[in-house]
C-alpha cells in the first residue's frame, strides 16, 4: 500500500494569505502572530505571506473566497474568534462562517485552513490563542503547509 501525505517542508514558491477578523482582536491578533510565526519557522519568507483583514468572522467567507479565486495563493488561512454571548448571534455567525469557508475550499480546490475559534468564554479563547491550549493560528498554518504539500504530491 502506498501512503501519500503532506509534510511541513518549505514549499518553495508557495504563497500564503492569512485572512483575519479584526473583531475580538485581543485574541485574533495572537492567532495571526502564531500563524505567521509557524510559516516563517518552516521556511516561508515574509514576502510570501499576506495579511488581509476583515471586520469580523461573518465577513471571512467572502474575503476568503475572493482571495482563493485571485489565483495568487497556494493556501488561505482563515482566522477569527466567535465567543458565545447571551443571544443566538453566536450560532448564526459560527455556522455561516464555517459553511462559507468550507464551501469556498470545495468550490476552488484550494487548501483553506480553518482557524476560527468558536468558544463559550473569553477564557477559552485566550487559552487557544497561545496559552494553555496552544495557538490555533499556528496549528491552522501547519495544516495549510501540509495541505499545500499534499496537493502537490497528488498532482504528480
From Swiss-Prot:
GO-annotated cellular components: cytosol; riboflavin synthase complex
Residues annotated as binding 5-amino-6-(D-ribitylamino)uracil: 23, 57-59, 81-83, 114
EC number: 2.5.1.78
Keywords in alphabetical order: Riboflavin biosynthesis, Transferase
Reaction(s) the record says it catalyses: (2S)-2-hydroxy-3-oxobutyl phosphate + 5-amino-6-(D-ribitylamino)uracil = 6,7-dimethyl-8-(1-D-ribityl)lumazine + phosphate + 2 H2O + H(+)
InterPro entries in the record: LS (IPR034964), LS/RS (IPR002180), LS/RS_sf (IPR036467)
Entry similarity comment: Belongs to the DMRL synthase family.
Complexes and interactors: Forms an icosahedral capsid composed of 60 subunits, arranged as a dodecamer of pentamers.
PANTHER family xrefs: 6,7-DIMETHYL-8-RIBITYLLUMAZINE SYNTHASE, 6,7-DIMETHYL-8-RIBITYLLUMAZINE SYNTHASE DMRL SYNTHASE LUMAZINE SYNTHASE
The protein's name: 6,7-dimethyl-8-ribityllumazine synthase
Amino acid at each position: 500500500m502506498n501512503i501519500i501525505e503532506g509534510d511541513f517542508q518549505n514549499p518553495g514558491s508557495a504563497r500564503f494569505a492569512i485572512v483575519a477578523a479584526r473583531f475580538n482582536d485581543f485574541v485574533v491578533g495572537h492567532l495571526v502572530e502564531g500563524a505567521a510565526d509557524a510559516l516563517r519557522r518552516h521556511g516561508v519568507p515574509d514576502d510570501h505571506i499576506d495579511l488581509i483583514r476583515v471586520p469580523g468572522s461573518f465577513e471571512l467567507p467572502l474575503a476568503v473566497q475572493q482571495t482563493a479565486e485571485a489565483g495568487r495563493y497556494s493556501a488561505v488561512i482563515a482566522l477569527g474568534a466567535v465567543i458565545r454571548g447571551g443571544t443566538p448571534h453566536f450560532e448564526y455567525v459560527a455556522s455561516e462562517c464555517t459553511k462559507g469557508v468550507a464551501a469556498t475550499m470545495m468550490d476552488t480546490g484550494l487548501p483553506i485552513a480553518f482557524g476560527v475559534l468558536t468558544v463559550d468564554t473569553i477564557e477559552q479563547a485566550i487559552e487557544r490563542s497561545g496559552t494553555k491550549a496552544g495557538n490555533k493560528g499556528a496549528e491552522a498554518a501547519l495544516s495549510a503547509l501540509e495541505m499545500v504539500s499534499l496537493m502537490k504530491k497528488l498532482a504528480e
